[in-house]
């Protein structure tokens, strides 16, 4: 089972970002992806976006790259300002990262039986790219920790005797993040949510389908997989059908200390007839290495993640020399 709860910042599985993808240099890391989510607005600007995750077994970790507003990010003058919010399955607020007008800093807030606000050392620097990591733990207590570039900036803990559930909805509140009535520009990119695994220092390279490879057994064109449009799809009429493809896109930083895993993400939905499960596979040296299948609903599409912590061909650690050049999807 994959520890991946969510990967990416594309509109296929994030609500509220249609039309906001942008390729301006500096908004994203070009070794990891090809675009970012860009916002432009006054200090009253509010444009939340969000995604949901399966219930985590462990703590929820959220990591992403943030470029604060290009001016006046260090001035917070509206009480409704909010950066991040975490909700339970029943939409009860669990925790929050909130810029506060009295300090101009981003504070961690745990919303348990009472609300607890932590002190903070973080003021957003104008237009300076940085990596944000947040840990949310829910049990007898609710704890939230807020990190910037791996350094803890704010934390808060509150009792949870009323038994609020684990985080299921992540909301980028994205409200009133600078302090002037003039347009400012800011960016989000490379979003990852992990189950019980720290996002600190982890970077995910997104590559996309390029061309059909060894298998083309499904109905539809590979264009439906590479266009980024959830409305265009391929279909399988029988269990065991495969479609495989080469990959295109960034290849990652020039130098990395280790590759922790390979993950294949698909967004799938069962039909009224035919197979109702899917999985991903890697093809290495002419051999298919299938992940465990996952049943998908027929009501609406859902993300399915297949993960390999090591090279399945020989159980060796991944390196940039052994990463697969061909991957695919398999109906089951």
Where are these regions (language model features)?
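Short, aromatic/His-centered strand-loop micro-motif at the edge of beta-sheets
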Residues: 107-131
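Localized edge beta-strand/strand-to-loop motifs within extracellular or lumenal beta-rich domains
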Residues: 128-143
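Short strand-turn-strand beta-turns centered on an Asx-Gly dipeptide
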Residues: 147-151, 285
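Flexible glycan-contacting loops in extracellular carbohydrate-active proteins
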Residues: 156-187
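Short carbohydrate-recognition loop motifs
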Residues: 19-52, 226-240
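Disulfide-rich extracellular domains of secreted proteins
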Residues: 1-15, 176-332
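Secretory/extracellular carbohydrate-interaction modules
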Residues: 41-106
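Extended, low-complexity, turn-rich repeat/linker tracts enriched in Gly/Pro/Ser/Thr and Asp/Glu
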Residues: 68-75, 138-142, 266-277
């Amino acid at each position: 089972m994959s520890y991946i709860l969510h990967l990416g910042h594309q509109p296929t599985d994030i609500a509220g970002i249609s039309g906001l993808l942008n390729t301006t240099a500096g908004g994203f890391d070009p070794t990891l992806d090809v675009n970012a989510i860009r916002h432009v607005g006054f200090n009253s600007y509010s444009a939340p976006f969000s995604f949901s995750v399966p219930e985590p077994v462990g703590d929820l970790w959220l990591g992403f790259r943030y470029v604060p507003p290009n001016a006046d990010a260090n001035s917070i003058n509206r009480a409704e300002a909010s950066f991040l919010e975490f909700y339970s399955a029943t939409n009860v607020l669990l925790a929050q990262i909130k810029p506060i007008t009295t300090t101009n800093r981003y504070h961690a807030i745990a919303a348990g039986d009472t609300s607890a606000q932590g002190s903070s050392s973080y003021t957003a620097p104008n237009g300076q790219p940085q990596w944000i990591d947040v840990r949310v733990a829910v049990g007898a207590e609710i704890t939230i920790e807020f990190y910037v570039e791996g350094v803890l900036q704010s934390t808060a803990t509150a009792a949870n005797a009323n038994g609020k559930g684990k985080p299921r909805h992540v909301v980028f509140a994205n409200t009133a993040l600078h302090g002037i009535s003039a347009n400012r520009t800011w960016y989000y990119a490379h979003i990852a949510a992990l189950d019980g695994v720290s996002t600190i220092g982890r970077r995910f390279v997104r590559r996309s389908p390029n061309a059909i490879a060894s298998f083309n057994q499904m109905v539809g064109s590979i264009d439906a997989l590479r266009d980024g449009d959830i409305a265009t799809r391929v279909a399988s009429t029988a269990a065991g059908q495969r479609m495989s493809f080469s990959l295109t896109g960034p290849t990652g930083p020039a130098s990395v200390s280790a590759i922790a895993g390979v993950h294949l993400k698909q967004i799938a939905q069962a039909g009224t007839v035919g197979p109702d499960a899917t999985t991903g596979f890697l093809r290495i040296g002419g051999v298919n290495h299938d992940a465990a299948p996952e049943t998908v609903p027929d009501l609406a599409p859902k993300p399915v993640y297949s993960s390999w912590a090591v090279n399945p061909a020989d159980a060796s650690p991944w390196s940039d020399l052994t990463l697969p050049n061909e991957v695919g999807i398999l109906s089951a």
